[in-house]
């Protein structure tokens, strides 16, 4: 049986070198820029609701789920002992955490038994989180444009 590990991480602290599949969640709107949500994490309901309200969220998660439901049986059939699926965002506290939790839940509902971890959740937040379109105040980029 293939062991399945789902994890979240912060791109600002480096990609996990042993991940088989890495998904970048930085396209989703960033709760960091919402003052009431900033101190919370992707484990908090308010953060999850904010992220799930992004217009790209539902379709993106459905496609990730479909891809994993296609690939995981193939990995198992090939005898792969361990598959690590990593979800990243800038700080590893909001988007990646919520999505990792959501995907793990969906995979459990589909009959898999993923182990779930959040590599950078307890790490102190980084200063200078990205401000790309839709992620910063008024949608400004890091250079204010």
Where are these regions (language model features)?
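A generic structural signal for well-ordered alpha-helical surface patches
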Residues: 62, 66-69, 97, 101, ...
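Solvent-exposed beta-strand sheet faces enriched in polar/charged residues
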Residues: 7, 86-88, 117
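C-terminal accessory "lid"/substrate-recognition subdomains
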Residues: 1-83, 122-125, 135-145
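Short beta-strand-centered segment that lines the nucleotide-binding/catalytic pocket of NTP-utilizing
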Residues: 112-123
């Amino acid at each position: 049986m293939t062991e399945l590990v789902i994890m979240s991480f912060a791109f600002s602290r480096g990609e996990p070198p042993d991940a088989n599949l890495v998904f970048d969640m930085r396209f989703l709107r960033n709760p960091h820029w919402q003052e009431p949500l900033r101190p919370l994490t992707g484990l908090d309901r308010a953060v999850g609701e904010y992220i799930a309200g992004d217009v790209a969220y539902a379709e993106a998660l459905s496609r990730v789920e479909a891809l994993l439901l296609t690939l995981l049986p193939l990995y198992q059939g090939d005898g792969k002992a361990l598959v690590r699926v990593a979800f990243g965002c800038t700080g590893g506290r909001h988007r990646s955490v919520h999505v990792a939790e959501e995907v793990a839940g969906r995979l459990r509902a589909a009959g898999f038994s993923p182990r779930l971890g959040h590599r950078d959740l307890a790490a102190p937040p980084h200063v200078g989180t990205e401000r790309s379109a839709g992620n910063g105040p008024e949608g400004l980029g890091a250079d204010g444009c």
